Amino acid sequence: KEGYLVSKSTGCKYECLKLGDNDYCLRECKQQYGKSSGGYCYAFACWCTHLYEQAVVWPLPNKTCN
């Protein structure tokens, strides 16, 4: 599974500016989803890879980013 890293409190994606390999996204994905996950910046938001099936990713039901 893969998807955009999301803030559970706001429903917002984690923004990033440096597209492609991105240390910030990699660090945040690993922190939220575990050491086996990966991450990079895609369309100015952190995209996480190698997630477990139950991982919560954007969009969150009933939570819009505002």
Curated annotation (Swiss-Prot):
Modified-residue entries (Asparagine amide), positions: 66
Xref: InterPro entries: LCN-type_CS_alpha_beta_dom, Scorpion_toxin-like, Scorpion_toxin-like_sf, Scorpion_toxinL, Scorpion_toxinL/defensin
Chain ranges passing through the membrane: none
Annotated consequence of substituting residue 66 to R: Non-amidated peptide that is less potent than the native peptide
UniProt domain LCN-type CS-alpha/beta: residue ranges: 1-66
GO cellular component, one term: extracellular space
Disulfide-bond pairs as recorded: 12-65, 16-41, 25-46, 29-48
Domain of life, per lineage: Eukaryota
Stated consequence of mutating residue 66 to H: Non-amidated peptide that is less potent than the native peptide
The entry's keywords: Amidation, Disulfide bond, Ion channel impairing toxin, Neurotoxin, Secreted, Toxin, Voltage-gated sodium channel impairing toxin
A Gene Ontology molecular function term of the record: sodium channel inhibitor activity
Similarity comment: Belongs to the long (4 C-C) scorpion toxin superfamily. Sodium channel inhibitor family. Beta subfamily.
Function: Beta toxin that binds site-4 of sodium channels (Nav) and reduces peak current (observed on Nav1.6/SCN8A (IC(50)=307 nM)), shifts the voltage of activation toward more negative potentials (observed on Nav1.6, Nav1.1 (weak), Nav1.2 (weak), and Nav1.7 (weak)), and induces resurgent currents at negative voltages following brief and strong depolarizations (observed on Nav1.6, Nav1.1 (weak), and Nav1.7 (weak)). A reduction of peak current of Nav1.5/SCN7A has been observed in another study (IC(50)=35-40 nM). This toxin is only active on mammals. It has been shown to bind phospholipids.
Entry domain remark: Has the structural arrangement of an alpha-helix connected to antiparallel beta-sheets by disulfide bonds (CS-alpha/beta).
Record-given protein name: Beta-mammal toxin Css2
Organism: Centruroides suffusus (Durango bark scorpion)
